[in-house]
């Protein structure tokens, strides 16, 4: 696959291709670092190109309490994805329970976006989900640990 300026790549770092010359490819990282890769390294190793296909899936994982109605949480997520103007209607976003974890139910939301809208949607969804979960009484739990205390035999003997 060929590279073009503005493609977004990931190897050890993620960045946008700014320039390609005979000897190296220049990437700019998201925290504004210029990274120069020798072209031999880019062509001889696996590289993920996030932009060449035009659209990208945003995988958002949310945890809810076991005491929360999971259907309500999924409805809230659907209303958020339906309302966001940058989320594509096709492929249709998927919202699924992906794990029954120790302290929470994990729900994953899979909306599709244009590649250039990925980070905008990512941050928008996190903010909207926090607001809507709070508004709808959907609890995002803390990790929980049950502790059981046992009295030792010596303690029991001194009380006799």
PLM regions with names:
Residues 21, 31, 41-43, 51, ...:
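A generic structural motif
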Residues 13, 23, 33, 56-60, ...:
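Envelope-exposed proteins and targeting segments
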Residues 50, 68, 78, 88-160:
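Solvent-exposed, non-transmembrane regulatory segments of membrane-associated proteins
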Residues 1-5, 9:
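Single conserved hydrophobic/aromatic residue that forms the stacking wall/gate
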Residues 14-18:
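Short beta-strand-centered aromatic/proline hotspots
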Residues 25-29, 37:
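SH3/SH3-like beta-barrel fold
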Residues 46:
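Anionic-ligand binding region
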Residues 51-86, 141:
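A membrane-cytosol interface segment of integral membrane proteins
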């Amino acid at each position: 696959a060929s590279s073009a300026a503005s493609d977004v790549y990931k190897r050890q770092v993620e960045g946008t291709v700014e320039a390609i010359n005979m000897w190296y490819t220049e990437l700019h990282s998201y925290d504004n670092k210029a990274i120069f890769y020798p072209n031999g390294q880019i062509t001889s190793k696996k590289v993920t190109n996030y932009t060449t296909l035009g659209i990208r899936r945003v995988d958002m994982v949310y945890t809810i309490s076991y005491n929360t109605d999971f259907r309500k949480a999924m409805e809230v997520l659907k209303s958020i994805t339906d309302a966001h103007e940058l989320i594509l209607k096709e492929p249709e976003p998927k919202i699924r329970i992906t794990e029954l974890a120790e302290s929470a139910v994990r729900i994953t939301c899979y909306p599709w976006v244009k590649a250039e809208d990925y980070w905008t949607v990512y941050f928008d969804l996190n903010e909207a989900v926090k607001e809507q979960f709070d508004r709808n009484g959907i609890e995002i739990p803390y990790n929980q640990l049950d502790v059981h205390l046992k009295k030792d035999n010596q303690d029991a003997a001194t009380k006799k």
